[in-house]
Amino acid sequence: MKKYLSLLLALSLAACGSKADTSANAADGSQTQDNAPTEAPAGEPVELIVFAAASMTETMNQLKEMYEQNNPNVTVTYNFDSSGKLLTQIKEGADCDLFISAAPKQMNAMDASLIGDAEKNPNGLDLIVTDSRVDLLENKVTLTVPAGNPKGIERFDQLAELLKGGEVLLAIGNSDVPVGQYTLKIFNYYGIDETAVANKLTYGNNVKEVASQVSEGAVDCGIIYATDAHSAGLTVVDSATAEMCGQVIYPAAVLKGDKEDAAQDFLAYLQTDAAMTVFESVGFSAA
């Protein structure tokens, strides 16, 4: 009888131990599962619409590829044109998440911090995230000539004399295009009356059109950005100084909307060393 009771007690203790081990193992397994690292969910697909000055076409297309490789959920869609036309499109309601202008004038027109300044923001627009605004790049205004330089043009001061004498045909940007506005400042510097030399001027809707006229030899010379001269393989014979036309600054800003974070991330990328290397390769410099 005692042997039977001893055996029964031993079996009971063994069963309890087995349940305890099972419970402990289950608990340990549950804890391990809860603490196991989980894969971060992929970002939601985003189409980022960027309006940028035409002079940025080549560099921005290269940077788009680089950025999308590291951000596969983001598709960058560009609209390149003159800054004046881009501003008009934005004012008319076109979708735009990030704007990069070839001059402060177009950015100022959307900046709420300048409301009250009738010259800079005449319509009192509040379209950009003011804190996001940065001076991104600087360019140079240059005098370029077609292959062979048939008129032997070498300097801006020489151009001014030839133009006043009606001896050259010059391609410039329209007055609503930043490169055209810089050109008019150069005219003012040399005392050139645009109306008086109108028959010796041809115009482009953006800087790419001006560069094309020079490349095709349709004109004797043209005034374009250094970066566009580089991209078109044109010869630069002179560069305008800040005294002649001011600094050529490219401001950038995020527009108000539902993609501000994505736009800010892309803008931050454009300020990295990797992006600046691309910009500098065609003649831009950090502002």
Name these PLM-found stretches:
Residues 12-15:
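C-terminal motif of bacterial Sec signal peptides marking the signal peptidase cleavage site
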Residues 87, 93-123, 129-134:
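Short beta-strand-centered segments that line the small-molecule binding cleft or hinge
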